[in-house]
């Protein structure tokens, strides 16, 4: 998809989504596009490496960081064939649902608005990564 800015705007039309980022995960582990001024623009290459790395056990026990915010993992099927989604929640008083979707070249990261249930984001990410996968093939 050539126009990530338009894609980000389209995703943010959903009032349940507060922030979104498209992040490369193979050759170029950086944020390709995100909401201007959004928290997810700060996702680091190291965080991408942890998300897509082979050691699933450690971050399931200790949690992980997304854009510097500590998160606890609720469900990890990010690298599972046919699913490709990880559900997490930020730690702290302002806990928000975070959902990460896996495509062949990029991760789609969504953060819900305060009070939005993670299951809603999970369904949205499944729909969005399905569309991205079709465009890549």
Curated annotation (Swiss-Prot):
Tissue expression summary: Testis specific.
The keyword Cytoplasm is annotated on this UniProt entry: yes
Pfam families per record: Profilin
GO cellular component, one term: cytoskeleton
InterPro entries named among the record's database cross-references: PFN, PFN_euk, PFN_sf, Profilin1/2/3_vertebrate
Locations listed in the record: Cytoplasm, Cytoskeleton; Nucleus
Highest taxon, organism lineage: Eukaryota
Annotated coiled-coil segments of the chain: none
Main location, first listed in the record: cytoplasm
Membership in a protein family: Belongs to the profilin family.
Function: Binds to actin and affects the structure of the cytoskeleton. Binds to poly-L-proline, phosphatidylinositol 3-phosphate (PtdIns(3)P), phosphatidylinositol 4,5-bisphosphate (PtdIns(4,5)P2) and phosphatidylinositol 4-phosphate (PtdIns(4)P). Slightly reduces actin polymerization. May be involved in spermatogenesis.
Protein name in the entry: Profilin-3
């Amino acid at each position: 998809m050539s126009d990530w800015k338009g894609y980000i705007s389209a995703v943010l039309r959903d009032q349940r989504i507060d922030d979104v980022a498209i992040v490369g995960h193979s050759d170029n582990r950086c944020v390709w596009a995100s909401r201007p001024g959004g928290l997810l623009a700060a996702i680091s290459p190291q965080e991408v490496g942890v998300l897509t790395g082979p050691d699933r056990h450690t971050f399931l026990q200790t949690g992980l960081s997304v854009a510097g915010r500590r998160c606890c993992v609720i469900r990890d099927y990010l690298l599972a064939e046919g699913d490709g989604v990880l559900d997490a929640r930020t730690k702290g008083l302002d806990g928000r649902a975070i959902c990460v979707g896996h495509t062949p070249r990029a991760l789609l990261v969504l953060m819900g608005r305060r009070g939005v249930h993670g299951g809603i984001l999970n369904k949205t990410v499944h729909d969005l990564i399905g569309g991205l996968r079709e465009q890549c093939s």
